[in-house]
């Protein structure tokens, strides 16, 4: 299980009561995604659904939550620039460093952790996803943009 610095545990302990809607020092299992994200984690929707289902109908103490937080923390890191670059490069059939903006939108909306149309629009409108005059996106720039967070 991943280790968490004591200062972070103290910070989470201070913030935990904000999610306690019954005043019993516990949170609903259905709130786990929100609580995890508020304390700096970014679990996938699939991870949140799995955890929420396992804790459906339960009220979780801070210690219960902390164990789940450590579990999610230890499940992996965000991909590296190289991971994103190599993944996007697969769609560059001509080896030009460009992929179709429409194809990129399709990939973002349908593969892996599927994004909504609004999320895709937000990513594409950002600095890295802008299409050139021919509707192509430089995937090196896009991968770098993704790594900026």
From Swiss-Prot:
Residues 7-42, 79-114 form the EF-hand domain. The keyword Iron does not apply. The keyword Repeat applies. One of its GO terms (cellular component) is myosin II complex. GO terms for molecular function: calcium ion binding. SUPFAM superfamilies: EF-hand. Gene3D superfamilies: EF-hand. PROSITE patterns: EF_HAND_2. It comes from the Eukaryota. Keywords: Motor protein, Myosin, Repeat. PANTHER family: MYOSIN LIGHT CHAIN 1, 3, MYOSIN LIGHT CHAIN 3. Myosin is a hexamer of 2 heavy chains and 4 light chains (two regulatory light chains and two essential light chains). This is Myosin, essential light chain. It comes from Branchiostoma floridae.
